[in-house]
Amino acid sequence: PVHSAEGYLARLIKGGCRVAIAEQTETPEEAKKRGGSKALVARDIVRFVTAGTLTEEALLEPRRANVLAAICEVRGTCGIAACDISTGRMELEECPPERLGAALARLGASEVVAPDGWDASPADCIPRPVSTFSSDGGEARLKAVHGVATLDGFGQFSRAMLAAAGGLIAYLDHVGRGRLPLLLPPVVLGQSAHLAMDEATRASLEILRSEERRVGKECLRLCR
């Protein structure tokens, strides 16, 4: 039932599933005109719901950004593109391959996409076509999304950043079936502006998530 959809979505997403939403694409009257009185009303997938592309407020954690990230490697440098589609904020950065794990731990992404067949990608990444992680394609997609002829007004982006941005936008286009969410101009993050912590350090400090016996006692929540 439609009124129970959010409850089922929550259970499926928490279980690691991706959900396809199908809806009627024509009225019963249009179906009759097309195929007579026994014609079935046409239905089609209108959206894919994934952990990193949730927009339903009831399914989002109010104190935590729901981050979708795309990662790739270009000429020995890893590019990272991250966004929260509920706010439209988009961040781009690059790092050496050995610091990719720490960068992803800092982001705490709900979902990560990476080029199919990339050996350095984390085990839980969603594989995507390698062709969507082209730096030239990423530059073109950013220009198209923001309706500009050049990206100079947004900052300086490396080829790795642009490739990751291309993969991110292509994935959003895929799950939205051609309808992109509102995205703000990308912001470049500098490595010197952050203290890097690996995943084990963040877990032991309980910065974002506490252990089960201390539910609701995360450091950031206690310090607000």
Predicted features and spans:
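Charged catalytic and DNA/RNA-contacting regions of genome-maintenance
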Residues: P1-K217, R224
